[in-house]
Amino acid sequence: MAKRGGLCVRIITELASAGELGALMQIENACFPPTERCTPAMMKARLQQFPEWCLTARRGGSIVGFIHGMSIGQPAVQDAFYYIPALHRPGAPWQCVLGLAVAPAFRGKGAAHSLMKAYAAKARKARKQGIVLACRAEKQAFYEHMGFVCAGISQSRYGGGVWLDMVQRF
């Protein structure tokens, strides 16, 4: 449970149901610019390909945030990971975050940190070497606060522009 400002957010580490795709997409659309958004079809494909890696934060039964991603072979993000869910390799040593999103009304209340903490605990339990993600420079400090280290400019150009690869080794 994350609690700040009188708000409790409970982390659910269960698969989001197909009926919750609309709620996930509503948050996705509120959090990312059009060039960086996951499409409904792609979100559905990700949920089908790696449901065990889609964690949700809920309040009163409603989804207020989520984190999802795939298992990969190296600590670097590639554009293909965003487009081809079949690249997920369950036994691979690294866990990649493809999306971390919290509804605007619930930001600053600990939901993102709780989601990442739960995701990391799950990755450790799965004996991963660590977590990797790509972020914009303005989010670097946010992820460093969660224990990530900048590994340099990412080879990913997803949605245009420059990304940084952030790595958290276990």
Name these PLM-found stretches.
Residues 9-24:
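A short beta-loop-alpha structural element at the N-terminal edge
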Residues 53, 129, 149:
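Short acidic/polar active-site loop segments enriched in Thr and Asp
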Residues 63-101, 107, 117, 157-162:
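Conserved acyl-donor/pantetheine-binding loop and adjacent beta-alpha core of acyl/acetyltransferases
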Residues 95, 116, 121-136:
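Conserved GNAT acetyl-CoA-binding A-motif
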Residues 113, 125, 137-161:
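Conserved active-site alpha-helix within GNAT-family acetyltransferase domains
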